[in-house]
Structure formats: structure tokens, C-alpha cells
């Protein structure tokens, strides 16, 4: 029985989810739980663990420095998420990804837009390119343009002369309202012609920014696929529901 095993456990490892109520009630005091629990968003759930006198080590708060690199679970999970997002999109997409030249004619390659060029985004770019897509990417950090282009993708530029965010960072940060308007216009212009959109943009401790609006979705081609990896933080796509597949008749 799972609960009997939990009752005898001293250290419990979890990947992405906080142990449910039954597990918490079955565990003994001073249990050590290690995993990624997003404490910014799950404060109440973590308080219930503290009430039970359970010790929680949330590895997503580890500093992203070289000494802690071997324990950087965020990067390893994001890497897998970026890869899986493209594979999932290819399964849902009704056509082939690469260009195919046959006796019956030529099939043009699928167009893929990656929003957010962090660890997940860069892996999504690399995977989509390997599968034969024409890839375009966007990120609020202009310094990642070189990384995006090194993977063979195009980079969408937004004039950020009025932005207060200039320094190098591994995380995206809050932008000015004026920048957000320019950003949405650029993304809308590119996204409506795409076959695949994968969104990965998140801001630590805050709700994920809406990058793909309803009007953009309505103008996209029939059969297009959006995979939103920011669902746990509210999503980058307007109207999305975390963990659910939604079919929109546009």
C-alpha cells in the first residue's frame, strides 16, 4: 500500500507536484520532501506541510550559479519540456513538418513560432529545426538573438529603446506597457501565419504574460497548434486551461 510506505518514509522525492492531502496525513513528522514546488504560487499548500512539521526543500529556488549547476532541476525539466512540446505539436498537427518533394508535388515545411528563448525555448527551437520546420523565435532579452540564430531560427526584434530592462539575465522580467503593446503587435503579425506556436515565457513569482491573444488565434490557419508551457503560471495564451486540450473553431 502506497500510504503505508509513505508512513515509513524519511525522505520523499517529487518532481513537480506537492504531495496530496492523503500523503501528507499519512506521513510522519520531520519527513523531508525534496522537489520543485513553485513556492510563489503554492504558498497555502506549502503551509499545510509546515503545519504537519514536514521539511520542504524546493529546488526551484536554487541560485543558477556554476556551483549549483549539477542540481539545476529547473533547467533539466525545462529542457525536456521544450523537446516534448514539439513532439506533442507534431502529433496534433495534421501535416508533415519537413519539406517533402515527391512525384505528386512539393509539400512546404511547417512554420513554427517559439515564444521565449530560455532553456525550454532553445530546446524547442533545436527540436523543431531537426524535424524540418521553418522556425522563428521571440524573447524580451535581446542578448539571446545570437543563441536563437545559432540554432538556425529567425529572431523577432521589438524596439525596446524605452524599456528599463537592459541587463543580462537568465530570467525574463516585467516590461513597460509601451513595450508590451509593441510586442503584442509584432507577435500578432508573425503568429497568424504560423502552423505551430510553442510558448514558454514565464516571470518568477508573477503571472505569465499573455502573448497570444484571442484575435490572433481567430486569424490563425485551420489546423494550427499551440502548445503553452506556461500553463502552471496562468499561460501565455488567452483562454487556455492548464492541462487541457482545447479545440477552437475559427
Name each model feature, range by range.
Residues 10, 16-17, 37-38, 202-203, ...:
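Short glycine-/small-residue-rich Rossmann-like dinucleotide-binding loops
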Residues 46, 86, 124-125, 145, ...:
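Generic hydrophobic/aromatic pocket-lining and core-packing "Φ" positions
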Residues 98-190:
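Glycine-rich phosphate/diphosphate-binding loop of Rossmann-like nucleotide-binding domains
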Residues 24-111:
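Glycine/serine-rich phosphate-binding loop and adjoining beta1-alpha1 elements at the start
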